[in-house]
Amino acid sequence: MSSLFKSTWNTRWLPSGDYRYIRTDCPRNITEEEIGFLIEHNILTVVDLREEVEYVKRPCPLENDNRFKYLHMPVSGGDVYPVTYEETMKAYDTMMDDNLLNIVDTIMNSATGVIYFCAAGKDRTGVVSAVILKKLGVDEKTILDDYMISKDNLMVRLEKIKQEHPNQTIRAIIPHPDYVKNILKKI
C-alpha cells in the first residue's frame, strides 16, 4: 500500500469503517491539495504525538492554519530510540499509560475527523491506532495488518535510518507484530 498523500510516506485511513481517522507520519510538506482533501472529508482536528524537541525542530504547517484545531499531545516515552527488539518491546510498554488513554479519548471524542501523527507514523501512531481500533471492536488481525502496512510504506526510509545509526538493529526499527500484540493484551 502506498501513502494516501504524495507529500508523506505513511498516510492512510484507519480501518475503522467510518473514515474519521487518518494516521500518518509528520505532514510537514503537506500540499494545498492535500489540505483540501482533509477539509473536504471533515478531518479538521490535528493531533501531534511528537515530543517537544521534534515538534520544535520540524514544525507541522497545519499548526498555524486556522481551519484546523491543532493539539500537541506527546506520547510518553516517544523520545526513546531502542537498539534491540527487547528494548523496543519495553518502549512500547512505556507508551501504554494514562496519558496515552487520554490521547485516544481525545481523538475518539473529537467533533470532527482527526489526523494524528508522530515522526514516522509507525510506533507512537501505531500504538494509538491499535488502541483506537481495539476500543472500536475491530478484530486483532485487522489491527495487526494495519500496523504492518508501515513496514512496507517505510522500508526505504528505515534502511536509511539503519545506515545512519549502525548500532541499531534493523529488527528494532522495523514494525513487528509482537510489539502491537503485546499492547493489545494490556487493553
What residue spans do the PLM features occupy?
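Cys-dependent protein tyrosine phosphatase-like superfamily
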Residues: 1-115, 127-187
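Ser/Thr-glycine-rich phosphate-binding loops at phosphate-binding pockets of nucleotides
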Residues: 120, 124-125
